[in-house]
Design a protein with these regions (language model features):
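Cell-wall glycan
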Residues: 55-69
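Well-structured core secondary-structure elements of compact alpha/beta domains
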Residues: 1-25, 40-56, 85-92
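Short beta-strand-initiation
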Residues: 3, 70-71
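FKBP-type peptidyl-prolyl cis-trans isomerase
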Residues: 7-12, 29-36, 60, 74-91
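Glycine-centered tight-turn and secondary-structure capping sites
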Residues: 25-30, 70
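Acidic-histidine catalytic/liganding microenvironments
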Residues: 26, 36, 67
Length: 92
């Protein structure tokens, strides 16, 4: 199994909650990632490319396993901070 995902990574839970609300109201995920994410992937609108099991921290991978392609996670906490994840592809 492989996934392709984009994410917005921030250190502040309140900011993550606010960004998730904006995404749910139709704001551009890519634009919010470029503006707010602290991950180097922000230059690609949050795109992390394809990855398989064991390549991401457990909380991130578990969220990807539960998402269907095109859907967005709730705020996911990891050792890196707070993620909003959008699954953009999956290969079973």
């Amino acid at each position: 199994m492989e996934w392709r995902a984009s994410h917005i990574l921030v250190k502040d839970k309140r900011l993550a909650d606010e960004l998730l609300k904006r995404v749910k109201r139709g704001a551009s995920f890519e634009a919010l990632a470029r503006k707010h994410s602290i991950c180097p992937s922000k230059s690609r609108g949050g795109d992390l490319g394809w990855f398989g099991p064991g390549k991401m921290v457990a909380a991130f991978e578990n969220a990807c396993r539960r998402l269907s392609s095109g859907s967005t996670s709730d705020v996911v906490s990891s050792s890196f901070g707070y993620h909003i994840i959008r699954l953009t592809g999956r290969k079973d």
